[in-house]
């Protein structure tokens, strides 16, 4: 018996751990396929809560809960069979209170399910708050908001405690109720069985044996309350996990067409593109792009100019299909993006976003992310003016970076992400304000190196700095989501329109910054003389 019980425990616990392992892998694989709209509507803390607490609850349901339920069933059948052999009438009377078990289990089980779901939802909120504070720890300290954030977290934690206590109180009722039913059954057996034994219906020995079998039946039934609790928790958590598993990206290619091979860059064309970010049902969308049309021939460099909020980043996000436009279409080498195989499309694009995301790994590992070989990422580091900077680190390319590259400056992170994109040798290079944190001289050196690299890649550069676009083959000026001007740098300046206004504003900002630096230098000189 002991060996059998050990074998059952080993089998079920191993199986539950394996299910947890497979489910975690499946969840992560699904998350990697979901589009930007999903992550825009779902908090990171909520996802993390599902991958930890909910997954653990499912494991407990398919492991310990199944084990105790199996033990209850087999133990119950064994005990009832021997009780029937001793006295069927007394067995029926003993089992009479157990008729209430399904009713209680169903009613309280639903309440447990709902309360545990509420607990898990609030745990997601709590996790999100903690994650945001840890990610923004420097901002919290800089604004001296430590106490305010502690108070906010404490209020959320109080609510989490209250929901947990509500769940615990309900579960606390379930266990004694099952114990009460077991006690009633025991009282019936002692009263009626004792009377039957005194009248000689069966022997005292049979009465004692019957009582022992009843005890064997009662303890598993009392534990059934815990099993119901685990099953309801697991069901609620599995429902939350299915929300991820059932999610699908809306960006899969219609036909999955492969791109024809290309020696250099590719032709990118926007035809009457209109776009707004996804909004909840019933809300009015705010159009970010309206009727945008332009062509970037293979091997050309097109600049996208515009003030903050003009739609530059949204336009760039549409090319690798992080989102799809609601109006118009975008074509790559004459093929609509929606018809292309998504992996093949993105494999030929190097995208450097405004946010310089760096992984917690070595510089070499970050540069090699998606690169074909060491030679490619070493050359890319040189083009991005990063090689000399890396040479200053003691461990050079093996320097371990902190979370999100915390031990790098903003400019260093931008150059690292640029080098990472270049290392893929993409046919289309997208730079979305990718050099905003570097000085204008370094920016000019990088752009000059890209022009003289000798490859014929297509480049689309979005920037609020006009200086980054002056050498582009064609410039598109966005204003309020519309393409209001087209042309080369000199042509647009001669018109005196929106592009000219952007340049004048930039020159004014630069002159103020230069004046401030000169003023500081003058102060430093005067203090030295004094």
Description of each model-found segment:
Residues 1-21, 29, 40, 93, ...:
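Transmembrane-helix motif of ABC transporter permease domains
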Residues 31, 153, 241, 270-272:
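Conserved catalytic Walker-motif region of ABC-type ATPase nucleotide-binding domains
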């Amino acid at each position: 018996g002991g060996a059998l019980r050990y074998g059952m425990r080993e089998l079920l616990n191993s199986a539950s751990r394996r299910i947890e392992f497979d489910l975690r892998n499946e969840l992560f694989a699904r998350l990697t396929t979901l589009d930007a709209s999903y992550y825009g509507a779902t908090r990171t803390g909520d996802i993390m809560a599902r991958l930890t607490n909910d997954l653990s609850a499912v494991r407990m349901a398919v492991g310990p809960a199944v084990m105790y339920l199996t033990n209850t069933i087999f133990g119950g059948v064994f005990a009832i069979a021997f009780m029937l052999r001793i006295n069927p009438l007394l067995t029926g009377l003993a089992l009479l209170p157990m008729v209430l078990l399904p009713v209680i289990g169903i009613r309280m089980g639903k309440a447990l399910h709902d309360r545990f779901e509420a607990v898990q939802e609030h745990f997601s909120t709590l996790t999100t708050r903690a994650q945001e504070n840890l990610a923004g720890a420097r901002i919290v300290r800089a604004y001296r908001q430590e106490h305010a954030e502690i108070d906010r977290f404490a209020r959320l934690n109080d609510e989490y405690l209250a929901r947990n206590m509500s769940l615990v109180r309900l579960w606390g009722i379930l266990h004694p109720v099952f114990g009460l039913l077991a006690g009633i059954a025991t009282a019936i057996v002692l009263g009626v069985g004792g009377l039957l034994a005194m009248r000689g219906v069966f022997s005292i020995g049979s009465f004692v044996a019957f009582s022992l079998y009843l005890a064997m039946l009662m303890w598993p039934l009392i534990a059934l309350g815990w099993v119901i609790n685990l099953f309801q928790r697991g069901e609620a958590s599995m429902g939350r996990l299915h929300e991820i598993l059932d999610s699908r990206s809306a960006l899969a290619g219609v036909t999955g067409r492969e791109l024809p091979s290309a020696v250099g860059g590719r032709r990118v064309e926007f035809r009457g593109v209109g776009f707004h970010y996804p909004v909840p049902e019933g809300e009015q969308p705010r159009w970010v792009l309206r009727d945008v049309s332009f062509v970037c021939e293979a091997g050309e460099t097109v600049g996208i100019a515009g003030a903050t909020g003009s739609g530059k980043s949204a336009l760039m996000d549409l090319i690798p299909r992080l989102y799809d436009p609601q109006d118009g279409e975008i074509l790559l080498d004459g093929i609509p993006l929606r018809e292309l195989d998504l992996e093949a499309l993105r494999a030929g694009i190097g995208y450097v976003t405004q946010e310089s995301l760096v992984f917690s790994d070595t510089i070499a590992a970050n540069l090699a992310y998606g690169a074909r070989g060491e030679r490619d990422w070493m050359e890319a580091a040189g083009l991005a003016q990063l090689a000399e900077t890396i040479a200053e680190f003691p461990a050079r390319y093996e320097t371990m970076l902190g979370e999100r590259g915390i031990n790098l400056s903003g400019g260093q992170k931008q150059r690292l992400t640029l080098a990472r994109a270049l290392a893929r040798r993409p046919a289309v290079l997208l730079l979305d304000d990718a050099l905003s944190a570097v000085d204008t001289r370094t920016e000019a050196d990088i752009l000059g190196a890209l022009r003289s690299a000798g490859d014929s890649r297509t480049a689309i550069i979005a920037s609020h700095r006009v200086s980054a676009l002056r050498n582009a083959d064609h410039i598109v000026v966005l204003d309020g989501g519309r393409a209001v001007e087209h042309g080369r740098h000199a042509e647009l300046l001669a018109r005196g329109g929106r592009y000219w206004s952007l340049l004048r504003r930039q020159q004014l900002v630069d002159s103020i910054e230069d004046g401030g630096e000169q003023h500081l230098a003058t102060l430093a000189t005067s203090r030295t003389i004094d």
